From Swiss-Prot:
It holds the Pfam family AAA_18. It catalyses: AMP + ATP = 2 ADP; ATP + H2O = ADP + phosphate + H(+). This is Putative adenylate kinase. It comes from Thermococcus kodakarensis (strain ATCC BAA-918 / JCM 12380 / KOD1). Keywords: ATP-binding, Kinase, Nucleotide-binding, Ribosome biogenesis, rRNA processing, Transferase.
Length: 177
């Protein structure tokens, strides 16, 4: 089974993916590292630009029939059995990205993406089985337990649980207006 864990930068993808893989006994794959290792994509202005079609094809070939948790904000473009879209309060994302040294423009871009559900919409366009999980105020262990419970219950689709419209005014200073 291939489980793709995706979301806006700062939601906790890597922490959750590693813990989920460990609990399930699955292989953990960081998509950025995988793409670099395979020579998929190129560096442009300090950012790795990845050819999504090439990534999907190579990943499908290399991990077909294996149990894998794929971690990355592009993982929802893979042929996955289940896509987990992690969400977090945009203000929390802004704070985390600020700590990581993100510039104002990139920070605003990501806060806006979370605010308007960009990754969730992309995931739904690409996949049938999409589960949305809000990580706000939860420990990584609590998030993984929630995911495992949903998997055990056979839940294939759960979306629409997050609405950030109430925090719009709080994140306004971070947006690129």
């Amino acid at each position: 089974m291939i489980i793709a864990v995706t979301g806006t930068p700062g939601v906790g993808k890597t922490t959750i993916s590693k813990l989920l893989a460990e609990k399930l006994g699955y292989e953990y794959v960081n998509l950025r590292d995988y793409a670099l290792e395979k020579g998929i994509g190129e560096m442009k202005e300090n950012e790795l630009e990845i050819d999504v079609d090439e990534l999907r094809e190579a990943f499908g070939r290399d991990f077909k029939g294996k149990n894998v948790v794929a971690d990355g904000h592009l993982s929802h473009f893979l042929k996955a059995d289940l896509v987990i879209v992690l969400r977090a309060n945009p203000k929390l994302i802004a704070e985390r990205l600020k700590e990581r040294g993100y510039g104002r423009e990139k920070l605003g871009e990501n806060v806006e993406a979370e605010l308007v559900d960009v990754i969730l919409v992309e995931a739904l366009e690409e996949n049938e089985n999409v589960i949305e999980v809000d990580t706000t105020g939860k420990t990584p262990e609590e998030v993984v337990e929630e995911i495992l419970n949903l998997i055990r219950r056979g839940v294939k689709r759960r979306v629409g649980i997050v609405d950030w419209s109430e925090v719009y005014d709080e994140v306004l200073p971070y947006l690129r207006l």
